[in-house]
Each structure stands twice: as C-alpha cells, then as structure tokens.
Regions:
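Surface-exposed amphipathic alpha-helical segments
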Residues: 157-184
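Short, well-ordered beta-strand elements
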Residues: 90-92, 149, 153-162
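Bacterial N-terminal signal peptides that target proteins for export
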Residues: 1-9
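Bacterial N-terminal signal peptides
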Residues: 8-18
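Short Gly/Thr-rich strand-loop-strand
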Residues: 46-61, 67-68, 100-147, 174, ...
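Short, surface-exposed beta-strand/loop micro-motifs that present aromatic residues
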Residues: 76-83, 143-151
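Sec/Tat signal peptide C-region and signal peptidase I cleavage site
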Residues: 20-24
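Short, compositionally biased low-complexity segments enriched in polar/charged residues
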Residues: 41-90, 94-96, 100
Length: 184
C-alpha cells in the first residue's frame, strides 16, 4: 500500500508542475496593459502600433532573443501605444510560464539599460508588483520616463515622452492592478 501511495503522490506532483506552466497561456495578455480609460486625457490609441507581441515579432532584429525568450519561458506579450500631440505613452506586458522568466527578463532589461550608455536618465527603485525601476529625465514636454517592474510571471513596462514622473507612477500602479487581477 505504501508504494501505491508514493506513485499516486508522484503523479500528483508531476501534474501540478505541468499545470502551472500550462495555465500561463490561459491569461489574456490584453488584460495586462493600460486601456484608454486609464491614460491621461488627450492620448489616443494607435491601433497600428498596438497588439499582441509574439516571440517571433519580439525577436526581429536581435539574433540573441529567440534563444533567450525560449529559455526564459516567454509565452506571449501585449503592447498598447497612445499618442498625444506632445508625446507618446507605451504600455507593455510580457507573460512567462513562471516567475523566474519575468525575473530573468527584468535582469536583462536592467543590464541592457546599464550597457546602452544612455545619458541623463536617473534610475530610482519603485515599489510596484515584486519591485522595479523608474528611469527618468527631463521635464515638461521633454520629460522621458520608463517604469519597469515584475509581478509573478509578468514583466511590465511603461514608457512615455511628455508625462511627468508622478503621473507615470500612478499609471504603472493602475497597470499593476490590472496585472494582479488577471493572473490570480
């Protein structure tokens, strides 16, 4: 009887390990980004620049990315872009099979930001999701802010020209609420 119980527990354990990654694909990635109602007045959705971001589309132009995305377990992603006469706001989210994938993506983006040599942006930690960073510089219409963070198996980011830091953090928190509701 004891060996039967071990087999049963082993089968259950295998099922649970397989079930969590399989469920990652069941999240609608469109639910992970900002919607029109979330963004400041005057910003309009650019339908041509918005939509699902498959691994294939994300890998174009960088031969390293297909292998990295596969290794990280990226399932899919989604991006919305909103345009305004004074700027652009982009909301994106990448869905992974597990939290390790979102952690690896975050580390990659932070490393790329360090090595890219972008001058004039200040990096500040933010308490959104499991933690993240705000890269910001400039003011008024010339302001550029990028917020990146992760939550469970989601890596998320917001980038904007012409949107001030405090407003960006509010938008990131709104997107985080959408993410938390979608990946429960």
């Amino acid at each position: 009887m004891m060996s039967w119980m071990r087999v049963f527990l082993a089968v259950i354990a295998c099922f649970l390990v397989a079930a969590v990654p399989a469920s990652a694909g069941q999240v609608n990635p469109q639910l992970l980004v900002l919607r029109q109602a979330d963004v400041p007045a005057g910003f309009a959705l650019d339908r041509e620049q918005s939509g699902q971001r498959t691994n294939e589309t994300e890998s174009k132009g960088d031969r390293r990315l297909p292998a990295l995305l596969e290794r990280w377990g990226r399932v899919t992603g989604y991006e919305t872009e909103y345009d305004h006469r004074d700027g652009t706001l982009t909301s994106r989210a990448d869905l992974f099979r597990n939290a390790e994938g979102s952690r690896l993506m975050m580390a990659y983006v932070v490393d790329e930001a360090k090595t890219s040599g972008i001058k004039g942006l200040r990096r500040t930690p933010v308490r959104i999701g499991s933690g993240g960073w705000l890269y910001g510089g400039g003011s008024g219409a010339g302001a550029f802010n990028l917020v990146i963070w992760r939550h469970q198996r989601v890596f998320a980011g917001l980038a904007a020209f012409g949107v001030q830091k405090d407003r960006m953090l509010g938008l990131a928190r709104a997107q985080q609420r959408r993410i938390a509701a979608a990946v429960r």
